[in-house]
Amino acid sequence: MTRPPNISEDVRLRLDIAYDGTDFAGWAVQAGQRTVAGLDEAFTTVFRTPVRLRAAGRTDTGVHATGQVAHVDIPGTALSKANPRSPHTGDPEFLPLLRRLSRLLPVDVRVLDIACAPVGFDARFSALRRHYRYRLSTAPYGVQPNQARYVTAWPRELDLDSMSAASRDLLGLRDFAVFCRHRHGATTIRELQRLEWSREGYLITAHITADAFCWSMVRSLIGALLAVGDHRRTIGWCGELLTKASRSSDFTTAPAHGLTFIRVDYPPDDELAERAVITRDLRSSF
């Protein structure tokens, strides 16, 4: 259930965000680097108080998003000043705020929607699953110019039947350490729920879904499967990699620009808080 803003307390907002990751060094704040989390600065300007966004997924350098979700806690008094009620009946509640942000933000990042978050909502820990898409072109000319920032050119034909068979060996709750860059204190156990391939002419698309992803996991999975697709490796090789306890150098990580974060799934509103507790416990138990 979503509560109306109360100026006497902080209000949690849900933000739906899209960005072209080409010129960003990922989501997370990094000293001296331009990152998507720099959205904090725009919100701080609008609300005249320091704020910090929490995202559903921290995308890597060069990775795009059409369906990133974040939350931010804003003092009710600051929110009421930054978002005066629209005089037009039927307009979205936060339309004035959305328009102010659109004027402040660079053209390669947009806040698509703003809403009061339901009670118990946490953009990261309430999430059930994240969906990514990876796109490649096997066209002899490479990639169409208007898609060059979002599609990876692949110089060889790919055997999608072999890639699909190898992908099935990776599904389920597993330790994906071999496909993840090390991050101190972070678990590499994830549930990979979908990894499917489709083809439309020269365009090949991977559809990837998991409860969560660790650092560089998606691009590493794609890189390993491409080695199967052009017959440098056997179908069973990817499954065999899972027996390794640390990241492998046996495959090349796929280029970042072909990857897009497209959607986050959440449970019904009355299950959000419980889901956040379960996720926190799960992440700390491994």
Swiss-Prot record:
It comes from the Bacteria. Substrate binds at residue 132. Its EC number is 5.4.99.12. The active site is at residue 60. It is an enzyme of class 5 (isomerase). GO terms for molecular function: RNA binding; tRNA pseudouridine(38-40) synthase activity. It catalyses: uridine(38/39/40) in tRNA = pseudouridine(38/39/40) in tRNA. Pfam families: PseudoU_synth_1. GO terms for biological process: tRNA pseudouridine synthesis. Keywords: Isomerase, tRNA processing. Belongs to the tRNA pseudouridine synthase TruA family. Formation of pseudouridine at positions 38, 39 and 40 in the anticodon stem and loop of transfer RNAs. Homodimer. This is tRNA pseudouridine synthase A. The lineage of its organism: Bacteria, Bacillati, Actinomycetota, Actinomycetes, Mycobacteriales.
